Amino acid sequence: MEGSWFHRKRFSFYLLLGFLLQGRGVTFTINCSGFGQHGADPTALNSVFNRKPFRPVTNISVPTQVNISFAMSAILDVNEQLHLLSSFLWLEMVWDNPFISWNPEECEGITKMSMAAKNLWLPDIFIIELMDVDKTPKGLTAYVSNEGRIRYKKPMKVDSICNLDIFYFPFDQQNCTLTFSSFLYTVDSMLLDMEKEVWEITDASRNILQTHGEWELLGLSKATAKLSRGGNLYDQIVFYVAIRRRPSLYVINLLVPSGFLVAIDALSFYLPVKSGNRVPFKITLLLGYNVFLLMMSDLLPTSGTPLIGVYFALCLSLMVGSLLETIFITHLLHVATTQPPPLPRWLHSLLLHCNSPGRCCPTAPQKENKGPGLTPTHLPGVKEPEVSAGQMPGPAEAELTGGSEWTRAQREHEAQKQHSVELWLQFSHAMDAMLFRLYLLFMASSIITVICLWNT
């Protein structure tokens, strides 16, 4: 008796499989005797539940069309190091089951009902870019209409791979893809289509977007494609998700403080070099900028080379260059006030060229030289008193003459030294002004270049 029962069950299975393989199926109407005010009797749908392992078609050569749609309710995170987009989606799939139908007039006016999704055949739609295990909650339900249309919705936390371009950080826009496809069914068995238009999906996503953090949704677009794998074609729908970073956090915490520090470094050129305060001030400012970069390093992407990193490198280079310039000018002043060598002729010519009106830098009005200078006897047109012939100086007069000549030579030496010191001081101030202008020019051109690159 037990063996005959087994053979009967096996015969029924092979008979059903034969009908499916031959392209023939059976449609039927659900008996409404199990319908009432408390819902439907599960036994009335047993014939549908028993077909759950098989694709619901009456002709196996006809592919099942699955319409998909989704709404993005949250952009959770964008991992620049791993190139991952974490989002939360509400996925909706709609398809027809020809084995389900009933007459609403005979079934208490019921046009649709909900039933456990585990009792129905479900499309194996997945996201190709998904980089984590599907964490869809269990025990979901699906809505079934009296015409056999099934509407199934499920929430999904999606960690998808996304090729991020962080060069324009923090003013960057990213384009990520979400590709929906079947894992098992080829184009001969399943076709994908849209349940809603793209603009409807975009508006719905913007309306229910619950996160107002670092990223905002710009828009969605879609494309259809066919994936060839192992000689089989799989239908696909590719959604392009455009998102944009909100840069206010990084502008306030990174760009503005860095700009202030560079501006203070530029203003420090107005500190007099002779006071000795410019070098310590610039060293303190440089150390403070390095501490600032160390504290803010957690806000920067850890992969790639963003443009903001180039901006910080330029700011650091400007500060180091200004410190070296100050050290150079301080050394010139030290040389000028201790043992100034004779100023080379070409430097003297360059200094005269720069001191001329409208040249390299404005010069202070020349002060009258009140120090020891040339004696009147060395001025043009003035001759030394001649000694009368036949008048030989005596010993006392010779001693006085020798002393006056030594004093005159010493005065000439002091005058030449003072003149050399003044020339070196003028040269130092001219170099300081010229290097300051070069500093401003390089700073302005660098900042303008970075801003133009950010705006492209």
Swiss-Prot record:
- The disulfides recorded in the entry are 162-176
- What does the record give as the reaction this protein catalyses? Na(+)(in) = Na(+)(out); K(+)(in) = K(+)(out); Ca(2+)(in) = Ca(2+)(out)
User: Where in this protein does the record put region HA-stretch?
Assistant: 401-432
So which residues are the signal peptide here? Answer: 1-25
Q: What does UniProt give as GO cellular component?
A: neuron projection; plasma membrane; postsynaptic membrane; serotonin-activated cation-selective channel complex; synapse; transmembrane transporter complex
Its membrane topology is listed as: Multi-pass membrane protein
Question: Tell me, what is an example of a GO biological process annotation in this record?
Answer: inorganic cation transmembrane transport
GO MF annotation, one: excitatory extracellular ligand-gated monoatomic ion channel activity
Could you tell me the superkingdom of the organism this chain comes from? Eukaryota
Q: Where in the cell is it found?
A: Postsynaptic cell membrane; Cell membrane
Q: In which tissues is it expressed?
A: Expressed in adult colon and intestine.
A Pfam family: Neur_chan_memb
Question: Which residue windows are transmembrane per the record?
Answer: 249-269, 283-303, 308-328, 434-454
**Record key words, sorted:** Cell membrane, Disulfide bond, Glycoprotein, Ion channel, Ion transport, Ligand-gated ion channel, Membrane, Postsynaptic cell membrane, Receptor, Signal, Synapse, Transmembrane, Transmembrane helix, Transport
- The segments annotated as topological domain Extracellular are 26-248, 304-307, 455-456
Task: Give the record's glycosylation annotations as residue positions.
Answer: 175
**Entry comment, domain topic:** The HA-stretch region of HTR3E seems to confer increased conductance to HTR3A/HTR3E heteropentamers compared to that of HTR3A homopentamers.
The job of this chain, per UniProt, is described as: Forms serotonin (5-hydroxytryptamine/5-HT3)-activated cation-selective channel complexes, which when activated cause fast, depolarizing responses in neurons.
Q: How does it assemble?
A: Forms homopentameric as well as heteropentameric serotonin-activated cation-selective channel complexes with HTR3A. The homomeric complex is not functional. Heteropentameric complexes display properties which resemble that of neuronal serotonin-activated channels in vivo.
The UniProt family comment states: Belongs to the ligand-gated ion channel (TC 1.A.9) family. 5-hydroxytryptamine receptor (TC 1.A.9.2) subfamily. HTR3E sub-subfamily.
Protein name as it appears in the record: 5-hydroxytryptamine receptor 3E
Provenance organism: Homo sapiens (Human)
